[in-house]
Amino acid sequence: VSSPAAVPWRRLLSWLQRLWLRLPLMDRWLTGELLGPLLFGIAAFTAVSLSVGVVFELVRKVAEAGLPPLVAMQVLGLRLPGFLVLSFPMATLMATLLGYSRLSGSSELTALRSIGVSTRRMVMPALSVALLMTALTFVFNDVIVPSANLAAADTLDTALGRALASERGDNVVYSRFGRIKIQDGDGERNARALAQLFYARRFREGEMEDVTLLDFSRPGQQQMLIAQTAVWNEARSMWEFRNGRIVNIAVEGNRTTSAQFDRYFYPFTAAPLEVGKLPSDAAQMTVGQALRAERLLREAGDGKEARRLRVRIQEKFAFPAICLVFGLIGSSLGVRPNARTSRSQGFGISVLLIFGYYLMSFIFSSLGVKGTLLPFFSAWLPVFIGLAGGLYLLRQASR
């Protein structure tokens, strides 16, 4: 008797089998020819990137820090999705290039042309596989990878005896801008400027540690607040600073007053708490977390960081589309008449194309962060250029 949990999976597999059998025989045959090179490409590129990115680091921790080998294997498995998702676009390029090159070299594509099958029709299975890999890449990148990387970090910290916290962050910085009175040669005037700057060296389980707050919002006076810890008091909607010192500096006369305190309530936004809960690296955020972080930065008046994050958000959507670009380019190159590409040649061509594409993406991303290009165009222009190049190659192959 099958368990209730297995019933949905059986239904899904049955539905996929029926869908597969409904496809034309030619599409099933061409798709089957792509699966072998696709799996080989995923395995090859994942093994290379995983070895360089994490294996050497774990081996060093096993040898020097006494990390148990079983825990190292567990961390390796949790880090695997992050490197697996990087291999999807590269494997798509390699699979389409090798698969169609082999069929072209054995004159099987020539036989299809002889019965009236167009080149565009031949590459449709490759584009379907590329679209499937695009969707899979987005799901991995947004759902699986962030949680897997967090679990890997927690597992490693636990094994090495570090403090484990579900909410944690380092170097939490939040700046708030506003209209404040500024004194100059013409007297006082209202201008938009930095009003408060909040900094905490560490954030653990809702508590900020080694906190410094600078307040420039009061005319003729600057205030600095230093505390060992700070927590958000929900009842008062204020920050509760503990075990610290408050220093007031009068601009005129350079007078300074200082006082120590055990507890001090300061009216400030809870935004630093949200910032502390977010991953510090945009690459480790989900789309929802990145949108929330961008909103916080925009509200804080940090235009440069907000723009950088808007670029990263667009890149989270544009990165999976690389599979479609590489699928179109690879199939267009492989479908050419008498195209013969060995596995080693396909690997080399794939590496060159991948390097060129990522170099172009890096350049456009830098222009977007600087503000030269809009975030949308900085992320999507490489995709549009790649698609245009792939369509040109497909047109050349159709002649």
Language-model features and meaning:
Residues W29, E33-P37, R121-T134:
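Start (N-cap) of specific transmembrane helices in multi-pass transporter permeases
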